[in-house]
């Protein structure tokens, strides 16, 4: 049999009624409707068989955008010159200017398939208030669009939608989401102060201003604003503090009290005056004369004990200066720390 080989399966003898089947050689296909086997008849004769193998193209190429029409789906014999026809798959539309047919060529290959079916387009997705739609992948069949919200808003609903087949057309798999404004919690209150311009809600970038009550000083920022972190509202920082003014305490000046000073002193003797070293004692009291009607007062020196090198502090300081005004005296005593 031309272009075919019998499948003997190792047999060398063929008794009467033995059936032998043939198989087409490579690049040949069995012609539909023709027998591919013979039988051993009486008298050791084989039954007649016609040529049943012929050159044929392989099963037509599978196309992503189209499928074979019904008569060609189960066919496996495609001799040279055979033409097959396609139909657009769901989700695609026909390009009327292009042919939907392919032909088996002499080299047993199919003619090149042009894209005679184009993807259908989903409807315009529209807009999201306070949000964005990413359509960088297009809106044709099989495309995915994604949704996002502007800063300060939170997305409620699907984050994406796919263009899918819906009946004889295509539609989006999910509706548009909603972008809702994010609010910060109620602003923190402060002691001894107020919040100026309070409102019911505080959205993204909205601020509040603090003010201190009279007599208090603000420590920190006067204003804070609403910001967003992981789709949750939070304040930009802590509130300020209102602190009372501190009263300055009166601290007496530090006075260095000398232990030994050199002052001029006059002895009771009417004819001599000399300088001696006197040691001051802060707790000693000065002896003064009876005050007169004016503010000038006279003080008299107390003669020290013989053999002693010290006198009372007041006496030693006033020695040689017989007259002091009351104001000057008081100032001296304050400086010495004897009066406060």
From Swiss-Prot:
Q: Which residues form the propeptide?
A: 313-340
Q: Where is this region: Disordered?
A: 235-317
Give the residue numbers of the GPI-anchor amidated serine lipid attachment: 312
What UniProt keywords apply to this chain's record, in alphabetical order? Cell membrane, Complement pathway, Disulfide bond, Glycoprotein, GPI-anchor, Immunity, Innate immunity, Lipoprotein, Membrane, Repeat, Sushi
Describe its membrane topology. Answer: Lipid-anchor; GPI-anchor
SMART domains on file: CCP
One GO CC annotation: side of membrane
Q: Where is the composition biased (Polar residues)?
A: 246-268
Which residues does the UniProt record annotate as the domain Sushi? 1-55, 56-119, 120-181, 182-244
Residues bearing carbohydrate: 54, 107
* Lipid metabolism as UniProt keyword: no
- Which stretches does UniProt call biased (Low complexity)? 269-287, 307-317
Q: Which family does it belong to?
A: Belongs to the receptors of complement activation (RCA) family.
Subunit and partners = Monomer (major form) and non-disulfide-linked, covalent homodimer (minor form). Interacts with ADGRE5.
Biological function: This protein recognizes C4b and C3b fragments that condense with cell-surface hydroxyl or amino groups when nascent C4b and C3b are locally generated during C4 and c3 activation. Interaction of daf with cell-associated C4b and C3b polypeptides interferes with their ability to catalyze the conversion of C2 and factor B to enzymatically active C2a and Bb and thereby prevents the formation of C4b2a and C3bBb, the amplification convertases of the complement cascade.
What does the comment on domains in this protein's record state? Answer: The first Sushi domain (SCR1) is not necessary for function. SCR2 and SCR4 provide the proper conformation for the active site on SCR3.
Q: By what name is this protein known?
A: Complement decay-accelerating factor
Q: Which organism is it from?
A: Pongo pygmaeus
């Amino acid at each position: 049999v031309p272009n075919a080989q019998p499948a003997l399966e190792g047999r060398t003898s063929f008794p009467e009624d033995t059936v032998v089947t043939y198989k087409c050689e490579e690049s040949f296909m069995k012609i539909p409707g023709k027998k591919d086997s013979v039988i051993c008849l009486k008298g050791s004769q084989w039954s007649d068989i016609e040529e049943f193998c012929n050159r044929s193209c392989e099963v037509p190429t599978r196309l992503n955008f189209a499928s074979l029409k019904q008569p060609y789906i189960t066919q496996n014999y495609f001799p040279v010159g055979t033409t097959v026809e396609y139909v657009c798959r769901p989700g695609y539309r026909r390009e009327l200017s292009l042919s939907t047919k392919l032909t088996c060529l002499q080299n047993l290959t199919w003619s090149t398939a042009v894209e005679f079916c184009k993807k259908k387009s989903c409807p315009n997705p529209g807009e999201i208030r306070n949000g964005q739609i990413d359509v960088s992948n297009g809106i044709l069949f099989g495309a995915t669009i994604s949704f996002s919200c502007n800063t300060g808003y939170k997305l409620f609903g699907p984050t994406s939608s796919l263009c899918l087949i819906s009946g004889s057309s295509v539609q989006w798999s999910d509706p548009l989401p909603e972008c809702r404004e994010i609010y910060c919690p109620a602003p923190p209150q402060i002691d001894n102060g107020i919040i100026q311009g309070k409102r019911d809600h505080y959205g993204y970038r909205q601020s509040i201003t603090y003010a201190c009550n009279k007599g208090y000083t603000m420590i920190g920022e006067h204003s804070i604003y609403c910001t967003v972190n992981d789709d949750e509202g939070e304040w930009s920082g802590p509130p300020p503090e209102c602190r009372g003014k501190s009263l300055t305490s009166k601290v007496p000046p530090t006075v260095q009290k000398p232990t030994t000073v050199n002052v001029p002193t006059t002895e009771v003797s009417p004819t001599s005056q000399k300088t001696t070293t006197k040691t001051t004692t802060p707790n000693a009291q000065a002896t003064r004369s009876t005050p007169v009607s004016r503010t000038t007062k006279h003080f008299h020196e107390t003669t020290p004990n013989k053999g002693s090198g010290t006198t009372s502090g007041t006496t030693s300081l006033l020695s040689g200066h017989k007259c002091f005004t009351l104001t000057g005296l008081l100032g001296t005593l304050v400086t010495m720390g004897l009066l406060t």
